[in-house]
A protein has these predicted regions:
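Short, aromatic-rich amphipathic segments at membrane interfaces
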Residues: 2-28, 154-166
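Alpha-helical transmembrane segments of polytopic membrane proteins
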Residues: 26-38, 174-176, 226-233, 279
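Start-transfer (signal-anchor) and selected internal transmembrane alpha helices
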Residues: 27-80
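Active-site lumenal/periplasmic loops and adjacent helix-entry segments of GT-C-fold
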Residues: 82-232
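Transmembrane helix irregularities
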Residues: 214, 265-274
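Short hydrophobic alpha-helices at membrane interfaces in multi-pass membrane enzymes
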Residues: 245-265
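Conserved small/polar residues in nucleotide/adenosyl-binding loops
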Residues: 285-286
Length: 286
């Protein structure tokens, strides 16, 4: 039964049938690596046990998260539907697509947000850009546009554009937001799931982080309206406030306070009241 199903599975996972261009080879390699990573984790759990592997991943979670972001930036992996431009221009929209399909309904991302971000490279990431409209436009007010300004301290996911350029900046923008959202949610659930013995329920935190990061609502609005940034700001500020209250060293408390202020600025500068009001009320109740 497995052997009979293999051709269909192979075609769906690797899409070997249409391999005709040289571009498909690196795409297949990236696809193979994406499949290999979870298989390595499963294999390690079988060989060494689920609990030791889980504890190792918990201890090195920030290093693992940074490694995932670095790999995505190096390989130019993002969730953008910018491939739709190939479709509009009469080309194959699946070119260089590792997985999935460019979504036509995500026009806010590939027609507005991403082109605005890319255009900043041609203006030196200036505060005003005259490439749109009949007069220079205020680009800082645009959520997705990176600007060389001090206020970008509160928009850390834009730093990839300034440091790495448009293509890898886009990869950083997508991957960093997802990884940081997962880690922030994980830390939040660790914080609220402590029992009286101060035992952290890592399994509960992991499931909670998965449910938040992969929630349909989050994924639907992932590319626009800064919902991930708002959630990250809330989760990180709650965790830092909890640690601020429990730490007596002044240097640590100052660092926690600084991070909370950055989160407050990040939340305020998302500039989307429809989400800010409801999430702000939720934060007050928490």
């Amino acid at each position: 039964m497995v052997m009979s199903a293999y051709p269909s599975i192979r075609e769906r996972l690797f899409r070997l049938a249409p391999v005709a261009s040289t571009e498909s080879v690196p795409v297949l390699c990236i696809r193979f690596l994406l499949i290999l990573m979870p298989l390595l984790v499963i294999g390690a759990m079988i060989a060494f046990g689920a609990k030791p592997v889980g504890m190792w991943m918990h201890r090195h979670r920030f290093i693992l998260g940074a490694s995932v972001i670095a790999a995505c930036v190096l390989l130019n992996i993002s969730g953008s539907s910018i491939g739709m431009w190939n479709y509009w221009l009469g080309h194959d929209m699946s070119t260089d697509v590792v997985w999935g399909t460019p979504r036509i309904m995500r026009t806010d991302e590939y027609v507005v947000g991403t082109p605005l971000a890319f255009s900043q490279r041609y203006s030196g990431y200036s505060y005003f850009n005259d490439l749109f409209g009949n007069k220079p436009a205020d680009m800082f007010i645009v959520k997705d546009a990176p600007v060389l300004a001090l206020a970008e301290l509160f928009r850390p996911f834009h730093w990839g554009y300034i440091l790495f350029g448009s293509s890898r900046g886009l990869a950083f923008y997508w991957s960093a937001r997802l990884v940081v959202l997962f880690l922030a949610a994980y830390e939040f659930f660790l914080c609220i799931s402590n029992d009286r013995r101060q035992e952290k329920h890592k399994g509960v935190a992991f499931v909670g982080a998965i449910l938040i990061a992969c929630a349909p609502l989050v994924q639907w609005w992932f590319a626009v309206n800064a919902l991930p940034e708002m959630l990250i700001a809330i989760f990180v500020s709650i965790v830092c406030f909890d640690r601020y209250l429990g730490d007596t060293e002044s240097g640590h408390r100052a660092a926690y306070a600084a991070v909370i202020l950055i989160c407050a600025g990040m939340f305020a500068l998302t500039l989307y009241p429809a989400w800010q009001i409801s999430l702000g009320l939720s934060l007050i109740h928490i």
